[in-house]
């Protein structure tokens, strides 16, 4: 009768016999090991209960660099995660998140960790000086392109080499076209002849000021004048030697420069060309913080597409 009443209330009861003592002990507080039952399960039910899978802990090695993963990170669980940017030989990475979520901190951390690889190079285009502290802490160079004395480039430094002279021709033609001057085949031929004359001069004489002085076309001189020391952007491009120098860790603050579209394209083209000469097979990390700002710029957007 007791069993009937209990079952009627929705409880499942069983009359114990040989297991009566264990069942009674298991009902008392503190007896955790008494009345341990091992019910018989069907195989399909058991398969659903068994832990046959686990959290993916990331790749064990970076096969492209034949080295360990970039870094070991903590997770919400008990399994750490091996973070690596490469999928095969492709290391393109995009980090998206709300303002203040820590994207710049993560980028700086990735840049610091990347130096674990032998002969690694890190070049970072910054906005708001978010990476300045860690770059200087790593012994790197930080160039604020809005600072009058931060950086000086000499785009014509190596024009004695045919490949460099060809690049310089395209660069000058781009500056002239950006000034709404039509670059005709005859003008390109004249630009090339001027470059050949300049290439025969000593390296320290290969400046934009001398190039403008050698140019015969008035439209060419007018278009290039803003980039000489007679104009507002000569401090960046009209030098008799490059102050950039080689460094395995370098960052460039772009905030002020990106507010000056006329200068941004010219400076970025020359700066990218210098960096591309360093992409010689060494492990290289190129970081663009606040990339949306750079994608808005026509030249920078085209350069990113070329890299990708």
Residue ranges and their predicted role:
Residues 65-145:
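Glycine-rich phosphate-binding loop of nucleotide-binding enzymes
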Residues 19, 128, 148:
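Residue-level "edge-of-site" marker
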Residues 1-39:
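Long, basic/Gly/Ser/Thr-rich N-terminal segments
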Residues 1, 100-101, 294:
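Short, charged/polar micro-motifs that form catalytic or ligand-binding hotspots
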